[in-house]
């Protein structure tokens, strides 16, 4: 169930004979328009974005603090005794979801990219966050999911009434699922859709922020961006798993396992890819940069400057190593442990 401002949020739409999608839409509209949520969004909007970089030439570079970074469709549960900060970015039509146990400080971050992974995904996130205490008080933050299309007022409910585009259905599903579950979810930040949308110089809608960083000790959240030095470890393989997981039935409806909470190690669970994916990648790699942006992004006008380059790096790896067993010998995970200087090394 959802709480806003310490008060249980009553879903009035559930008492009416509305379809499930209409109920979800109405609930999302009501929560987003709550004065507490609106004020929190205005405050978040005025925060300075934290640029996380481990480049030695960068004045903001810092590996003294212990970071965990999450890619698309991944999740991690971190212990504040072992990790200082956990975050994600590149969430345009995706949503960075944070769930933190107020008592223990155990924090889970997921990069949700589809309504189809929300139900199982939230269950995965909560497994270690709850620590067998189903009555725990949980703080929740959502960042990303900008308004990627013009949402029409189809039935008089509000600006977000008609589910279109990619962001809206995902945001609806997230809020609806939290409301239906028995755990106590205190919504602190809902920086999504209209709250997280601006116009660029060409009058295209784009996100104000597409990432966030959580201080595990305090629970404070900041808008954040990362780069190639801080999106680690094993960036390319972890990115490839997102595409290949669609062909691997063992990952259906699930978030990707990434990080071991107890040992503070990245354990990149194996994932298979087929020759069909390799052939498809070869065809995509023949496209121009503009064609790649148009065909491979849910939000072409909102992607970062390194979007196409990242895809070409991923495809280059797949074309070089078309057999998944070369990356995951004997179907064993790729394991990385933290070094004394804050970086990661492969075990």
From Swiss-Prot:
UniProt keyword Magnesium present: no
Top-level enzyme category: hydrolase
Enzymatic reactions: N-terminal L-asparaginyl-[protein] + H2O + H(+) = N-terminal L-aspartyl-[protein] + NH4(+)
UniProt KW Repeat keyword: no
GO molecular function: protein-N-terminal asparagine amidohydrolase activity
Catalytic activity, EC: 3.5.1.121
Keywords, in A-Z order: Hydrolase
Pfam family, one: N_Asn_amidohyd
Function: N-terminal asparagine deamidase that mediates deamidation of N-terminal asparagine residues to aspartate. Required for the ubiquitin-dependent turnover of intracellular proteins that initiate with Met-Asn. These proteins are acetylated on the retained initiator methionine and can subsequently be modified by the removal of N-acetyl methionine by acylaminoacid hydrolase (AAH). Conversion of the resulting N-terminal asparagine to aspartate by NTAN1 renders the protein susceptible to arginylation, polyubiquitination and degradation as specified by the N-end rule.
Protein name listed in UniProt: Protein N-terminal asparagine amidohydrolase
Organism: Arabidopsis thaliana (Mouse-ear cress)
């Amino acid at each position: 169930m959802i709480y806003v401002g310490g008060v249980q949020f009553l879903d009035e739409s559930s008492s009416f004979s509305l379809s499930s999608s209409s109920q979800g839409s109405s609930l999302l509209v009501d929560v987003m328009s709550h004065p507490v949520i609106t004020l929190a969004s205005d405050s978040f909007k005025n925060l300075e974005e934290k640029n996380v970089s481990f480049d030695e030439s960068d004045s903001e570079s810092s590996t003294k603090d212990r970071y965990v970074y999450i890619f698309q469709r991944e999740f991690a549960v971190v212990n504040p005794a072992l990790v200082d900060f956990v975050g994600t970015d590149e969430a345009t039509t995706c949503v960075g979801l944070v769930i933190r146990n107020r008592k223990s400080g155990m924090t889970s971050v997921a990069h949700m990219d589809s309504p189809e992974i929300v139900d199982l995904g939230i269950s995965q996130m909560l497994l270690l966050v709850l620590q067998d205490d189903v009555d725990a008080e949980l703080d929740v933050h959502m960042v990303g999911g900008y308004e990627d299309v013009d949402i029409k007022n189809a039935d008089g409910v509000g600006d977000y009434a008609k589910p279109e585009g990619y962001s809206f259905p995902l945001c609806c599903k997230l809020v609806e699922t939290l409301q239906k579950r028995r755990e106590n979810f205190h919504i602190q930040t809902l920086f999504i859709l209209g709250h997280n949308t601006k116009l660029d110089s060409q009058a295209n809608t784009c996100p104000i922020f597409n990432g966030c960083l959580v201080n595990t000790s305090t629970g404070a959240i900041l808008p954040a961006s990362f780069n190639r030095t801080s999106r680690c470890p094993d960036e390319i393989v972890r990115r490839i798993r997102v595409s290949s997981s669609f062909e691997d039935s063992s990952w259906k409806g699930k978030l990707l396992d990434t990080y071991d909470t107890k040992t503070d190690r990245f354990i990149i669970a194996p994932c298979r890819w087929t020759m069909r994916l390799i052939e498809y990648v070869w065809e995509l790699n023949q496209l121009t940069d503009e064609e790649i942006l148009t065909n491979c992004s849910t939000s072409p006008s909102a992607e970062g400057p390194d979007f196409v380059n990242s895809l070409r790096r991923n495809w280059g790896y797949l074309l070089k190593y078309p057999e998944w067993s070369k990356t995951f010998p004997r179907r064993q995970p790729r394991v990385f442990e933290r070094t004394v200087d804050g970086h990661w090394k492969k075990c």
